[in-house]
UniProtKB/Swiss-Prot annotation:
Entry keywords, A to Z: DNA damage, DNA repair
Organism: Streptococcus gordonii (strain Challis / ATCC 35105 / BCRC 15272 / CH1 / DL1 / V288)
Protein name as it appears in the record: DNA mismatch repair protein MutL
GO CC annotation terms, alphabetical: mismatch repair complex
Gene Ontology molecular function, alphabetical: ATP binding; ATP hydrolysis activity; ATP-dependent DNA damage sensor activity; mismatched DNA binding
Compositionally biased intervals (Basic and acidic residues): 390-400, 408-423
Keyword set includes Metal-binding: no
Function: This protein is involved in the repair of mismatches in DNA. It is required for dam-dependent methyl-directed DNA mismatch repair. May act as a 'molecular matchmaker', a protein that promotes the formation of a stable complex between two or more DNA-binding proteins in an ATP-dependent manner without itself being part of a final effector complex.
Family to which this protein belongs: Belongs to the DNA mismatch repair MutL/HexB family.
Tagged with keyword DNA damage: yes
SMART domains: DNA_mis_repair, MutL_C
Region (Disordered): 390-423
Length: 647
């Protein structure tokens, strides 16, 4: 008897499903891509329990003929290609004929479809790949596919599913990418009756970007365009001031297909040159039109890996297109715009509206534990607050209760002093936390301050000789120990905001933040859902300075998105490192004598005044002996050759 047998088709489909259908988002991707290939202009995706209970995709495409519907459940049955040569001219998103049979083999599958010229529609019901019903029905032109109880017959796969929030986040990401790839299609994603994503389908890519990432982000995107004999590159990239902490916001499309390609990611970063800060990445949507003969999409069943001929030439074209577009832009952030933002909420951000722009010396305010350009700023704040009147907006009484006024938070460009901090990334933060936990309090010499150099280094003398102090590293250490103590010191001491802040995030980020909201709450930050893809902040811990709120909350959420499973203790420590680095005195800022002496005093009170949180030295010491050697006032001890017994 032969040992080798041909597997039953249903079993073969279940095996294939292991590669094609990894999770609910894989089902959504395959079904929506089929709808796009069918010429749909409107696609609605409805899911329940993150797709594990129900996934329903409805489109207004061309539909499937009655006699072809059962064939759609047969493996390698497709309308996209007919002969070998077609493999080299693929312009559709699907072509392998594996998705539908793979999905049907691991779910309870229902399809209703009708064509424009058909006499009636078609209803087909299958369970585990076995067709149970196939009959005519009344149905509008287009296709509706409903998937129920995904993986009901492969329980081992269910065990490896993540939380519903995580799976939903993957689905939202898939729809976002497809929306960017096909702005001409109107997408609607509904989860458990709640609308998550909606795009207009106008064909305008910038509008699609605004629908996904928000209007403020879309305004800071720059159009790019370039072409040669083989490639056409178009799309949008963010200004250097608008960055994110990872590459997740880079979308690369080839002939309308979202792909992942490390070298093309590298080309995008190369286009920015030195304009990007270390550890920061742009937002980008790059659409590449290419002769299908130069791109092999038949590499993996998911079709996200594509092999490209002339890849180096394409990389150069992308880099040049981005560099050329950025060169035409005014890359200096609009100071007037920032000042206008600060005046929207005068009663709560007075120090930003009162800065004397002609002076560059910093003064330390002991009460507020911070530096200002002018010592009178802290005093002016009181009279300013008394005279300022909050701005109130008219509200509809019938509408949902809203605060009298809100401020939409924007991500401000991070300071370029981060170029000095290549260690400001997740891996180095974790290493720094481990080292900091082992620190012990040490003694510190009494220092007498007497000068500053280049607005960066402080000079002081003590019994040990001359000390040179890096003022940024020094305050970074001071701030770190302040934040380390305060972050997570959650009590009833919350400061109510006169004008609450609104923070906007993409839908998939919203889901992940909600999933890990407990970490933020344990750090003293309480965000409430407010409208579509928005959080509102109504109060903040007293230790959190109000002028730090916009950047601080976005930074805390960015870190939340980057961090894997972590304890609240470690999350607080990493936040303390990041916030101390970004909020310390920058280089090239002169300090008055009082502020410099106060900084040295604060440094002396630190548990470890010798290193910044990243481990870099805060100060170096030249002893009197070292100085005398440098000026050759004393000589090194020498032993003569005769004394060594050579002669």
């Amino acid at each position: 008897m032969s040992k080798i047998i041909e597997l039953p088709e249903i079993l073969a489909n279940q095996i294939a499903a292991g590669e094609v259908i990894e999770r609910p988002s894989s089902v959504v991707k395959e079904l929506v891509e089929n709808s796009i290939d069918a010429g749909a202009s409107q696609i609605t995706i409805e899911i329940e329990e993150a797709g594990l209970k129900t996934i329903q995709v409805t489109d207004n495409g061309e539909g499937i003929d009655h006699e072809d519907v059962p064939l759609a459940l047969r493996r390698h049955a497709t309308s996209k290609i007919k002969k070998q040569a077609d493999l080299f001219r693929i312009r559709t998103l699907g072509f392998r004929g594996e998705a539908i049979p793979s999905i049907a083999s691991v779910s309870r599958f229902t399809i209703e479809t009708a064509t424009e010229n058909g006499q009636h529609g078609t209803l087909l019901v299958a369970q585990g790949g076995e067709i149970e019903e196939h009959e005519p029905t009344s149905s509008p032109v287009g296709t509706k596919i409903k998937i129920e109880d995904l993986f009901f017959n492969t329980p081992a796969r269910l065990k490896y599913m993540k939380s519903q929030q995580a799976e939903l986040s993957h689905i939202v990401d898939v729809i976002n990418r497809l929306s960017l790839a096909h702005p001409e299609v109107a997408f609607t994603l509904i989860s458990d009756g709640r609308e998550m994503t909606r795009t207009a389908g106008s064909g305008n890519l910038r509008q699609a970007i605004a629908g996904i990432y928000g209007l403020a982000t879309a305004k800071k995107m720059v159009e790019i365009s370039a072409s040669d004999l083989d490639f056409e590159v178009s799309g949008y990239v963010s200004l250097p001031e608008l960055t994110r902490a990872n590459r997740n916001y880079i979308t690369i499309l080839i002939n309308g297909r979202y792909i992942k390609n490390f070298l093309l990611n590298r080309a995008i970063l190369d286009g920015y040159g030195s304009k990007l800060m270390v550890g920061r990445f742009p937002l980008a949507v790059i659409n590449i039109q290419i002769d299908p003969y130069l791109a092999d999409v038949n590499v993996h069943p998911t079709k996200q890996e594509v092999r490209i001929s002339k890849e180096r030439e394409l990389m150069a074209l992308i880099s040049q297109a981005i560099a050329a577009s950025l060169k035409e832009q005014d890359l200096i952030p609009d100071a007037l715009e920032n000042l206008a933002k600060s005046t929207v909420k005068r009663a709560t951000k007075p120090e930003q509206t009162s800065l004397p722009l002609k002076e560059n010396r910093l003064y330390y305010d002991k009460e507020r534990n911070d530096f200002f350009l002018k010592p009178q700023v802290a005093e002016q704040q009181i009279s300013f607050e008394e005279s300022a009147e909050p701005i109130h907006e008219a509200t509809d009484e019938k509408a949902e209760p809203q605060p009298t006024s809100v401020k939409f938070a924007e991500r401000k460009p991070a300071s370029y002093d981060q170029l000095d901090h290549p260690e400001l990334n997740q891996a180095s933060l974790e290493r720094a936390v481990d080292k900091l936990e082992q620190e012990e309090k040490s003694s510190f010499p009494e220092l007498e301050y007497f000068g500053q150099m280049h607005g960066t280094y402080l000079f002081a003398q003590g019994k040990g000789g001359l000390y040179i102090i890096d003022q940024h590293a020094a305050q970074e250490r001071v701030k770190y120990e302040y934040y380390r103590e305060k972050i997570g010191d959650v009590d009833n001491s919350q400061q109510q905001l006169l004008v609450p802040y609104i923070f906007e995030f993409p839908a998939d980020d919203m889901l992940r933040i909600k999933q890990r909201m407990k970490l933020l709450e344990d750090a003293g930050i309480f965000l409430e859902e407010y409208g579509a893809n928005q959080f509102i902040l109504r109060e903040h811990p007293i230790w959190f300075k109000e002028e730090e709120i916009e950047d601080g909350i976005y930074e805390m959420c960015d870190m939340l998105l980057l961090t894997k499973e972590v304890s609240i203790k470690k999350y607080r420590a990493e936040l303390a490192i990041m916030m101390s680095c970004k909020r310390s005195i920058k280089a090239n800022h002169g300090l008055d004598d009082y502020s410099a002496r106060d900084l040295l005093f604060q440094l002396s009170q630190c548990d470890n005044p010798y290193n910044c949180p990243h481990g870099r030295p805060v100060l170096v010491n030249f002893t009197k002996s070292d100085m005398e050697k440098m000026f050759r006032r004393i000589q090194e001890n020498h032993t003569s050759l005769r004394e060594l017994g050579k002669y």
